[in-house]
């Protein structure tokens, strides 16, 4: 700990943090401490606080235990910051604020107020939180809610002030002076000419979405969802919430609604806020896009699109979306895709799911010494020789007799070993000496070999020991894992939810598959292909049908299902056609963030990816090309990995193998994903990749029987084609 007045060096400036989880259920191992673990990640994130976790503990909801830990961490460990999570509500055992008040020497009410203000703009239930913030010695103590989402939100609300607060407590003279000097250079805001008009809560709700969009338009060059008002230079809840980094989203943390306008009547991103925050938008790994705010109420209320379809002559002649590399597009999709929450399911429904909790064995397996073979339970010390048979031990029965010297007992595979026996001799190493007159019973047997103690016996707990972790969190379950759940008697298990995927085709020219072909019309194959692709991976789907090329129809179709689906896939309406309005509906009507609208690839150039945050829940939107092959190829390249991440699969990337070309292949200026059929020849290490023929993006026949995509590089002056026998990368998309 730095002494009074000491100038801190860079090494001394490391923030030492303790995370204290207050929860009866977590303390008793009845629940996982998600909030505490998440806070540790947030604290250590260099783009956030960049601190060091010096202490972590789980205590029950007991005042004395909470106090004892806080005092120890303040006085003995001399931590700079303590974050508690849990016990701040109205329940009888929620006593964290009371314990904290008995420990702190000075209160920090501004921080508690910032958390309450921010929470109330997320949910009215925020008023039920009772956080206490205060100081003991040179340690700052912050009470956060017990939920993972609530604790993360409140941590982010106070984050901009934390580094400066800790510098003040540590008397870090140089750093404190730097911030104060920057604040002194700021102009004071002029007095208001008139008091701001008061509005009813109802009116504020109605105007929220419009206000946010207008402010976003005024700050187009900003990488964050905040606004800058020249007449205001104070830190607001809006400025704080606007700095939530997208790097958190890439870890699968539930997204917060970036409705920054609703957090303050005069939101600002002032130099003071920048000076007191360690969050930098430059560190954000996502494309610089405008952040939009939406609520379910505002979206569902809209039935008429705001897209202007009258000025056809003024439509874009060139796409306004820059070309995005395939690598960047793929990384963006995974970074913007959240991991879904969890649910409890019956183990019989566990195929293909990802475990959200470790699974432990409740019993030993086997629970008794068991025979490995059919034979005779013997005393190893007796050695070879003739033995009397005293009975039989069968699987499912517990023998009551004890094997004495000169005796053996007949056993079957899996049967319990009787008392007195310490080895099993297989039936092949014996000879029958005597039997009953009717031949129904063995009476005496000759042991032909010397048995070893423990021979052919599975001891108690040999396969699985009681308390052993048999399946780890994050395990992607298959038939064997389902069998293990049954083995250890775990009939209910917590898993990550499956994403629900809604699929829609767009186009005035489309007919349903059962319809007769009419002039100017074609049957819709994209929807069937995409639904089948998603269902083949086990995900639940919603069929949204065909929607015409009309903004109102597109908006209403999306509104109808957007609350029921986690992912929406559309095909068509994303290139340069005069009737293609989908991107405009996403942008203007739904206020979605379009992260990319063109990808440098073949097929699939106009592939579009967008996200929409509604009331704190992120919706993923893939607007795929209308050409049938382009739609299914981009679905495999982008959609399937995103769905795998959403369900919690640790590595959602597709499987890529090496294969030899069966024929010469000409290269395209764009990276190409060429459909092929993989086959193995006898004793060859690599499969052979046979092209499916004409690769025109409208020719669905090129997908027939295809189980791979040749990942061909773009053409260069040196390389215009690849030759038969060359080894290339192939992405596996079907059964091998």
Curated annotation (Swiss-Prot):
Entry GO CC: cytoplasm; cytoskeleton; cytosol; dendrite; postsynaptic density; postsynaptic membrane; postsynaptic specialization; synaptic membrane
Keywords, alphabetical: ATP-binding, Cell membrane, Cell projection, Cytoplasm, Cytoskeleton, Lipoprotein, Magnesium, Membrane, Metal-binding, Molybdenum, Molybdenum cofactor biosynthesis, Multifunctional enzyme, Nucleotide-binding, Postsynaptic cell membrane, Synapse, Transferase
Biological-process GO terms, alphabetical: establishment of synaptic specificity at neuromuscular junction; gamma-aminobutyric acid receptor clustering; glycine receptor clustering; Mo-molybdopterin cofactor biosynthetic process
Region (MPT Mo-transferase): 14-153
NCBIfam families referenced in this protein's UniProt entry, alphabetically: Glp_gephyrin, molyb_syn
Subunit structure: Homotrimer, homodimer and homooligomer. Interacts with glycine receptors.
Protein name: Gephyrin
Organism encoding this protein: Gallus gallus
Gene of this entry: GPHN
